Amino acid sequence: MASRLLLNNGAKMPILGLGTWKSPPGQVTEAVKVAIDVGYRHIDCAHVYQNENEVGVAIQEKLREQVVKREELFIVSKLWCTYHEKGLVKGACQKTLSDLKLDYLDLYLIHWPTGFKPGKEFFPLDESGNVVPSDTNILDTWAAMEELVDEGLVKAIGISNFNHLQVEMILNKPGLKYKPAVNQIECHPYLTQEKLIQYCQSKGIVVTAYSPLGSPDRPWAKPEDPSLLEDPRIKAIAAKHNKTTAQVLIRFPMQRNLVVIPKSVTPERIAENFKVFDFELSSQDMTTLLSYNRNWRVCALLSCTSHKDYPFHEEF
């Protein structure tokens, strides 16, 4: 198992990263420090997580202690939906760089294809509770992302939560300068994403799987929701390999040539989640896990279903 995947800009992206969505600011500094000590070299961030400053403190400390060099780290962040206007993209990226205390990002993603009205609110809502869209389009936003590469602020650019038609739109953009390096999507045994993954990989786009454990700490979880970590069928596969369910759920995307970014702020779990390079799921295990697909999404962005660029009305 290669520990890094080659991106279309020539960079090598660590196949396993630490996710920081929902990591409380008071805990994320310690989490990132532990992760780097344990061997993680890829940290997945975003402006909307409201903890990039604290992530940056941890990165700086580890650089200062010479535990790691900057060029060994792979730092990812994301452009939030309220910054899709061409004139706002660079400032949003600079804010992230300043919070993370870095000169450049290894990868910068458009977080969602849906542009929102600019302003202080991350989710600007109208009277009926729907998100207020911006009149931006994906291609203009992409052109502004390309400028960040030319200016040296980011090494690679990509997308997140884009369906295959939206990916195709970028690939067919007149005057396209840089292809998306990555599409980061939700992916786990209940949402296996075969068609979208096959499409992206056929175009030389690496896929990152987020919420590989089903995001059990999501604020909107309902008691009747299915639980990957408690699924007896997945527990059985884990027992067979003498591994935890989480380790199986992290290894599963890796064997599909996906990058995977499990989130934890618990030192023991951060270390446990990294111990996935010393075993292999059989092809039977892989087929079995793929068969559990039920097209169940943790992140459906339901406040945006009427947005013109809402990604999940399409089959893939």
UniProtKB/Swiss-Prot annotation:
GO terms for biological process: C21-steroid hormone biosynthetic process; carbohydrate metabolic process; cellular hyperosmotic salinity response; daunorubicin metabolic process; doxorubicin metabolic process; epithelial cell maturation; fructose biosynthetic process; metanephric collecting duct development. The modification N6-acetyllysine is found at residues 95, 222, 263. The record marks 78 as: Lowers pKa of active site Tyr. PROSITE patterns: ALDOKETO_REDUCTASE_1, ALDOKETO_REDUCTASE_2, ALDOKETO_REDUCTASE_3. Keywords: Acetylation, Cytoplasm, Lipid metabolism, NADP, Oxidoreductase, Phosphoprotein. Changing residue 49 to F: Complete loss of glyceraldehyde oxidoreductase activity. It catalyses: an alditol + NADP(+) = an aldose + NADPH + H(+); all-trans-retinol + NADP(+) = all-trans-retinal + NADPH + H(+); 9-cis-retinol + NADP(+) = 9-cis-retinal + NADPH + H(+); 13-cis-retinol + NADP(+) = 13-cis-retinal + NADPH + H(+). Pfam families: Aldo_ket_red (PF00248). The modification N-acetylalanine is found at residue 2. One of its GO terms (cellular component) is mitochondrion. Its EC number is 1.1.1.21, 1.1.1.300, 1.1.1.372, 1.1.1.54. The active site is at 49 (proton donor). Monomer. Catalyzes the NADPH-dependent reduction of a wide variety of carbonyl-containing compounds to their corresponding alcohols. Displays enzymatic activity towards endogenous metabolites such as aromatic and aliphatic aldehydes, ketones, monosacharides, bile acids and xenobiotics substrates. Key enzyme in the polyol pathway, catalyzes reduction of glucose to sorbitol during hyperglycemia. Reduces steroids and their derivatives and prostaglandins. Displays low enzymatic activity toward all-trans-retinal, 9-cis-retinal, and 13-cis-retinal. This is Aldo-keto reductase family 1 member B1. The gene is AKR1B1.
